[in-house]
Each structure stands twice: as structure tokens, then as C-alpha cells.
Amino acid sequence: MALAKRIIPCLDVKDGRVVKGVRFRGLRDAGDPAELAHHYYRHGADEIVFLDISASPEGRRLMVDVVRRTAEKVFIPMTVGGGISDVEDFRRALTAGADKVSVNTAAVENPELISEAADIFGSQCVVVAIDAKREPLKPEHEHVADHIFSNDDGEYWFRVYVRGGREPVDLDAITWAKRVEELGAGEILLTSIDADGTQEGYDIELTREVCNAVSIPVIASGGCGHPKHMVEVFKEADADAALAASIFHYGKFTIEEVKEHLAERGVRVRQC
């Protein structure tokens, strides 16, 4: 029997408070992280993801406190990411109570960090976040765009971005997904920058291509505005988990409602 699909609220944390932006811009305050996480835990979340987008050292210290407070009353897997740059950052997050640590920019700049962390803490603790955006294929990218797609507007590829989705790098997202699996990552957190915050649905094509390319679990992220979008990403892209923020933070749907919607449409989920 196939594993149950996971529903994961994402909490973007800045200076100890939860915020949510549209396409990584225009942040809104959505409350206390530990309280929100506990609310989602009680209402059937399968996991929690904290992404720390603080810029200051003080914000980073506040994040450790958030993780510690959350771990005292939330008993589902918790992933922490944002600002992770070395093995000591992994250790700090795990010691505070995280079950998994998500790394993005530092992994692109130093891929050996993935294997180093996996060797020390185990692959199950290592999540590589991949932020990807579809871009028109230009001649200067043909040597790095290993996977090329086309539509009525022409050819395009999925490009990796770092530093919170602000900075493009010459790296094909599907190639990078394969590489992080080889290096020992236990899971991929895949965000479509195009879809993030729009509430118009996940990027099915991007998610499907990455899921087909790797054997480790893939969490789809970016664009969820309705439970039907989760049905699509599970059935059409075969994602292992769906991450969402806006639809939960502002009370648009409860996790119970989402799971009921999925179950009615034949998607296996853990019941609340």
C-alpha cells in the first residue's frame, strides 16, 4: 500500500514572528510560531516546517528559542531551515528540537555540506530546499540547461535560485535534484518561485519532473490556494507531501477540511 500523503503547514519566521509573503516579497505578520505550530499539530498536521528568514544574528537566536518552545508541545516531525550554512547550524537546530534541517544556498555553494551532514546526523535529517523558476532558454544557458521544455512561447528550463529566491545560479533544477540525492539528502523541499504566494496552484510540471528524477521524497511547495491544488499535485505529479501557508494561516481552510477533501477524491491521508 502506498504511503499516506503528508500535509505540511509552512511557517516563515522573521525575528521570532510568523509572516507570509507573495513571491518572497511583501511580508505579513501571521502570529506566534510556537502557538501556530501547536494549533496545526492539534488539528491534524503531519509535519511542521519553519523557514527562518531573519537577517540579523538576533533573529537567528530567536529562531532557536522558537524551535525549543515548539518541541515542548508539538509531537510531529519538525523541519527547520533558513540561514543554515554549516554542520554546526545543523547541530544547533537538531539540539533545539528539530527533527530535520533544510538547507538551500549553502548546499549550492558547497555541495559537500549535504554529504557531511548526512554522514554525521543521518540522511533522514537532511532536507535540501530547491527554489526553481522557469526561464526562457537563452544561448548562454544551453550548456547548463540539461532539461529543456517547450510551449507556444518557445523553449524554457527550470533554473535554481538562491538567497531566498532572489539570486539565479547557472544550475538546472532537475539536475540539481538528482545530485542532492546522490550526495545523501533524505528529502527535497521543492518551491516554485513562479507559483509561490499566488494561491493559483502548484507548478505541476516542475514537481512531476523532479519527482520522476529522484527516488527520495519530494515536498511540493508554492501556490496552494485550495485543497483541489493538493489533489492535483498528488495525483498528477506524485508529490509525497504538500506544503502550504496562506490557506492555513488566515483561516481559509482547516487541515481537517483539506484532508477530508483529499480522502473524498481517493488520496490516502492520515486521518485527523
Swiss-Prot record:
Gene3D superfamilies: Aldolase class I. The keyword Amino-acid biosynthesis applies. Transmembrane segments: none annotated. One of its GO terms (molecular function) is imidazoleglycerol-phosphate synthase activity. Keywords: Amino-acid biosynthesis, Cytoplasm, Histidine biosynthesis, Lyase. GO terms for biological process: L-histidine biosynthetic process. It is an enzyme of class 4 (lyase). It comes from the Archaea. Its main location: cytoplasm. It is found in: Cytoplasm. Pfam families: His_biosynth (PF00977). It catalyses: 5-[(5-phospho-1-deoxy-D-ribulos-1-ylimino)methylamino]-1-(5-phospho-beta-D-ribosyl)imidazole-4-carboxamide + L-glutamine = D-erythro-1-(imidazol-4-yl)glycerol 3-phosphate + 5-amino-1-(5-phospho-beta-D-ribosyl)imidazole-4-carboxamide + L-glutamate + H(+). HAMAP family: HisF. Belongs to the HisA/HisF family. IGPS catalyzes the conversion of PRFAR and glutamine to IGP, AICAR and glutamate. The HisF subunit catalyzes the cyclization activity that produces IGP and AICAR from PRFAR using the ammonia provided by the HisH subunit. This is Imidazole glycerol phosphate synthase subunit HisF.
